């Protein structure tokens, strides 16, 4: 399949390159040029008044929690989890996770998200939803190491990895998913690390999300979560660490030296009053930071444009520094950094020879005028509804705001029905 995107503006680094033509051959960006003279074009997309940029990457979410959107709001994390969310999650079925995942994927594709990282359960059903939709994902079975048989818990994660890692021509990747230090003691984590090394897998976990978590771990082990993880050897494998809100300067050095990828979830952290991660210091020390929404029950959406704008504004206010997290850095966090953290190679930028993972944003709208700085407009003015076209591995998932791979009406109906059936269950 050879697709030509004509007369499109392209985001390359921190600049908009105007009026180019992008030739996509199968799943690769074959050529970017001024010419339209190509042999055998199967499909043409009009790029006029649009910006092509890398697809957005949600580095941390719990997709099937779309079913709990709006169910429990305005509560602290511990109460929200223990009294509201966990009792409902205990009722979930595999079908619930499948339809909840599809609902989230519809929302993400509509907003220009082309890849995400998720930790949950019934992950075979989520993987099926990913396979059907055409989106990319790094998936992890959430593992709790303090309840039941530790070996059985670990084996579920390992079995899932064997079945799905690099499936769908590499669109689906798998990490092992020990939930957090407060649910996974060092003895269990050591087993997870050994398996990750044996299978050449990364690890996805939650770290230092709240002040209470940090204090509890210090009381239990005499170390902060990040120092504890460093001691047990977690950072000897590629790690995606979600949150990292309460970290000190020495811990930031550890994250940098060990190459830990951090999923910054600014909106969820604010909504749950968890705090604000020291992103400025992380970036200064070379920590690779991506952006995430967290679950749609704690955000309450999967809109990466909101996270992009928030990361570029929140830290300016917190640091009292107007140049902290400039527009260019916010976009890199949401694209290139995210793909690298998830382990997808040759993606995250628009370049010849790279994967055709890109979106087209319609900038022929009042909030993009006057066009003094379109890079700035993408961060401070754009929204999900501006995304016109989504292409993943050279496959069109959405064009002119129409989803091509999913039955959106059916998915919304099924998800709504299941969400309210869950609430009715005793």
Swiss-Prot record:
Pfam families (UniProt xref): Amidohydro_1
Keywords, comma-separated and alphabetical: Hydrolase, Metal-binding, Zinc
CDD domains reported for this sequence: ATZ_TRZ_like (cd01298)
Major enzyme class: hydrolase
Residue numbers binding substrate: 89, 179, 209, 294
One of the record's GO molecular function terms: S-adenosylhomocysteine deaminase activity
Catalysed reaction equations from the record: S-adenosyl-L-homocysteine + H2O + H(+) = S-inosyl-L-homocysteine + NH4(+); S-methyl-5'-thioadenosine + H2O + H(+) = S-methyl-5'-thioinosine + NH4(+)
Family: Belongs to the metallo-dependent hydrolases superfamily. MTA/SAH deaminase family.
Function: Catalyzes the deamination of 5-methylthioadenosine and S-adenosyl-L-homocysteine into 5-methylthioinosine and S-inosyl-L-homocysteine, respectively. Is also able to deaminate adenosine.
Organism encoding this protein: Dictyoglomus thermophilum (strain ATCC 35947 / DSM 3960 / H-6-12)
Entries under InterPro entries matching the protein: Amidohydro-rel, Deaminase_MtaD/DadD, Metal-dep_hydrolase_composite, Metal_Hydrolase, MTA/SAH_deaminase
Domain of life where this protein originates: Bacteria
Cofactor requirements of the protein: Zn(2+)
EC number: 3.5.4.28, 3.5.4.31
Listed name of the protein: 5-methylthioadenosine/S-adenosylhomocysteine deaminase
Residues that hold Zn(2+) according to the record: 60, 62, 206, 294
Free-text cofactor note: Binds 1 zinc ion per subunit.
